[in-house]
Amino acid sequence: MSFVNIRSSRGPVVKVCGLQSLKAAQCALDSDADLLGIICVPGRERTVDPVVAMEISALVRACRTSMSTPKYLVGVFRNQSKEDVLRIANDYGIDIVQLHGDEPWQEYQKFLGLPVIKRLVFPRDCDILLSTPSEKTHLFMPLFDSEAGGTGELLDWNSISDWFAEQGNPECLQFMLAGGLTPENVSDALQLHGVIGVDVSGGVETNGMKDMDKITNFVRNAKKES
């Protein structure tokens, strides 16, 4: 698996993250989300139960052959060793690794042999994006998010979009956006320069639990931009 097909797809990439139940995962798939995310960082509010993780993984694999566009499972990690990430990725059948800490993504990608989504904080981490060789974009997807992630903190979208435009709008620098996204504002986010996809967790929850209506509406509103 690589990001080539995702980057060349007609519509935006939509990821629903922080999934902790088979019901929510099925809803995300039924809504046509492209990426399903599970938190593999120990001790977090949205950390997935190992049994549920494997059930979601089996569901994604089963749907991959029956849906018009392939769906992939993303495991989110933060400052965990390469060995731990590889073990969990193998146990859960993860397709894409998302690194949400200070990990050197190229080192991890080479060790894991999996595509990587790398969380970047704006403007601190822009140099990481600028220094990424264009030939690596099939293995690397940048994601602008807050430092902690999953907090609902709204990023300064306009500054990020303006920065991308200042670079000349290069396709190799296109990125996913997270932070404060909701069914109500996702369409606006996808109008910004450089945004190739969106990543949501808290924005599709009610009282800390995944809300099926919000998942459906979020994906539907995002896909309207295709």
Curated annotation (Swiss-Prot):
Key words, A-Z: Amino-acid biosynthesis, Aromatic amino acid biosynthesis, Isomerase, Tryptophan biosynthesis
Recorded superkingdom: Eukaryota
CDD domains: PRAI
Pathway linked to the protein: Amino-acid biosynthesis; L-tryptophan biosynthesis; L-tryptophan from chorismate: step 3/5
One MF annotation (Gene Ontology) recorded for this entry: phosphoribosylanthranilate isomerase activity
Protein EC: 5.3.1.24
Pfam family, one: PRAI
Principal EC category: isomerase
GO-annotated biological processes: L-tryptophan biosynthetic process
InterPro entries named in the record: Aldolase_TIM, PRAI_dom, RibuloseP-bd_barrel, TrpF_fam
Catalysed conversion reaction: N-(5-phospho-beta-D-ribosyl)anthranilate = 1-(2-carboxyphenylamino)-1-deoxy-D-ribulose 5-phosphate
Family: Belongs to the TrpF family.
The protein's name in its UniProt record: N-(5'-phosphoribosyl)anthranilate isomerase
Species per Swiss-Prot/TrEMBL record: Saccharomyces kudriavzevii (strain ATCC MYA-4449 / AS 2.2408 / CBS 8840 / NBRC 1802 / NCYC 2889) (Yeast)
